[in-house]
């Protein structure tokens, strides 16, 4: 007996009727069953009836599968698909604001709906796609009323001076000041169209506009006196942020007053000694400049612990002047730092642009001075003591010689410049020949002046570095052979 076995591929008898394809189906985890009504008037304005019966005197469009709870533009949606005769391979979704469908193999997404009005209605559709490329002909749909979120603007952290850093409740600047802020809009930062700023007054006509993606502005030629800066932003729907201002009495960590100082003379004294709370060193430099230049013929800048947030302001402050006298701390603690290293780029630009710099760094936190390259460096007093009557000789003229008038109780440096980096180099002071108790050999330099070649036909300004302290915050230190004012008299009469 022969038995024939066969397998019916089609699993039904009538081969003339092909099997019916099962299309995939799509589901959203959120199911909305309400209806929103919309109406457009003759001027093109759209009105909605949400969670209320529409006025029967008008013709309304109906938006089904809607939520009547007003939400924000940030929407997190989840979905899934099923296919009885195959496998769901992905999904296509589209918002009512989109012109095309977008494919994804994910089953969730976070969306920021591009709202352009204070209140608008958006619908979301998603349909599954199976392994044969078939698509759900009836996408799952959701309609959402979305309210515009107001944008936010706040000053960048530390972009305004802290009272702790400047040692005062008043911030003093020269006529250039940069303000920096951060922008945020829940509806997407691209919806922020305008930033407005004002000085001293917030009247309707007092605001100036810049583009909505700007996060800073540099104000120049600010008039001397007390000022307040205001800034706000606006989104495409017309919603505005709260006004941010500096100074702000509600923020007691920041400076509580902003004073713009006039630019006096073409010489700037930079006080980089925050621990000199009594300003004894500054008073000494001021008195010296009164003698050399005359009163009101120079300006001074008390930096405190931190430079301005924007290097643009540092550069601008220096460039107001022809010559800068920058003195650093005699001795720092962990709570205070010199700032000249962080000003390096601005100092280099100043010198290369023709400005003259005298700088007196004592506590060397870094020796890679771009503005004065060093070949080598030694500690003159490893025991931290440089005693009185030690002579500092000038190879230029012995009448310029200085000597230690009060104990220098910090470690100080001698150095040798990297001559290959300079177009010209002049030693102004070196240590006298050592005796048996001294910690140096030979005559290490302690004050030198260099100049760079910027172009084949142009030289830079002159930069002078002095590594012995001229003042310790209590008294001058190099007055044992006459006042050290003679150093500055020489510089201003012969070099600067």
Annotate the PLM regions.
Residues 37-39, 190, 275-281, 436-438, ...:
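Short, solvent-exposed loop/turn elements at domain surfaces
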Residues 270-272, 360, 466:
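Short hydrophobic segments within beta-strands
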Residues 4, 8-262:
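Low-complexity, disordered linker/stalk regions enriched in Pro/Thr/Ser/Gly
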Residues 11, 264, 437-496:
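Extracellular ligand-binding/catalytic regions of CAZymes and related secreted enzymes
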Residues 330-432, 483:
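A glycine-rich, often tryptophan-bearing local segment used as a flexible ligand/cofactor-contacting loop or short
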Residues 274-275, 331, 364-366, 434, ...:
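Short, solvent-exposed loop/turn segments at secondary-structure junctions
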Residues 265-275:
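Short beta-strand segments enriched in small/hydrophobic residues
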Residues 277-371, 376:
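Helical hinge/lid and interdomain linker segments adjacent to catalytic or ligand-binding clefts
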């Amino acid at each position: 007996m022969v038995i024939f076995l066969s397998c019916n591929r089609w699993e039904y008898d009538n081969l003339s009727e092909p099997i019916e394809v099962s299309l995939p189906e799509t589901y959203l985890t959120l199911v909305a069953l309400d209806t929103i009504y919309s109406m457009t008037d003759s001027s093109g304005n759209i009105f909605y009836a949400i969670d209320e019966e529409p006025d029967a005197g008008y013709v309304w469009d109906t938006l089904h599968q809607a939520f009547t709870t007003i939400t924000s533009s940030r929407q997190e949606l989840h979905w899934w698909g099923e296919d009885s005769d195959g496998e769901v391979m992905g999904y296509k979704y589209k918002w009512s604001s989109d012109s095309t469908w977008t494919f994804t193999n994910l089953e969730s997404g976070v969306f920021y709906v591009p709202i352009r009005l204070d209140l608008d209605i958006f619908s979301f559709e998603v349909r599954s796609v199976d392994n044969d490329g078939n698509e759900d002909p009836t996408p799952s749909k959701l309609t959402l009323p979305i309210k515009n979120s107001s944008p936010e603007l706040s000053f960048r952290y530390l972009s305004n001076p802290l009272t702790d850093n400047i040692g005062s409740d008043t911030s003093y600047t020269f006529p250039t000041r940069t303000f920096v802020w951060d922008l945020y809009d829940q509806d997407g930062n691209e919806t922020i169209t305008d930033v407005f700023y004002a000085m001293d007054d917030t009247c309707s006509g007092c605001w100036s506009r810049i583009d909505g993606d700007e996060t800073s502005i540099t104000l120049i030629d600010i008039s001397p006196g007390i000022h307040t800066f205001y800034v706000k932003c606006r989104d495409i729907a017309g919603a505005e942020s709260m006004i941010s201002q500096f100074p702000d009495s509600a923020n007691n960590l920041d400076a509580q007053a902003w004073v713009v100082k006039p630019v006096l003379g073409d010489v700037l004294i930079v006080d980089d000694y925050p621990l000199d709370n009594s300003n004894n060193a500054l008073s000494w430099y001021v008195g010296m400049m009164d003698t050399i230049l005359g009163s009101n013929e120079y300006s001074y800048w008390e930096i405190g612990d931190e430079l301005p947030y924007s290097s643009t302001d540092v550069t601008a402050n220096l460039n107001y002047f022809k010559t800068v006298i920058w003195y650093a701390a005699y001795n720092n603690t962990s709570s205070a730092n010199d700032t000249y290293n962080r000003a390096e780029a601005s100092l280099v630009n100043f010198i290369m642009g023709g400005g003259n710099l005298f700088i007196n760094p004592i506590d060397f936190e870094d020796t890679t001075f771009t503005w004065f390259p060093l070949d080598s460096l030694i500690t003159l007093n490893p025991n931290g003591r440089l005693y009185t009557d030690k002579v500092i000789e000038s190879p230029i003229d012995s009448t310029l010689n200085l000597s230690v008038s009060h104990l220098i109780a910090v470690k100080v440096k001698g150095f040798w410049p990297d001559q290959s980096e300079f177009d010209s180099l002049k030693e102004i002071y070196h240590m006298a020949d050592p005796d048996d108790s001294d910690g140096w050999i030979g005559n290490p330099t302690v004050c030198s002046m260099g100049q760079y070649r910027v172009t084949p036909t142009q030289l830079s300004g002159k930069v002078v570095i002095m590594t012995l302290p001229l003042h310790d915050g209590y008294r001058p230190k190099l007055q044992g052979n006459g006042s050290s004012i003679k150093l500055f008299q020489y510089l201003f009469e012969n070099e600067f």
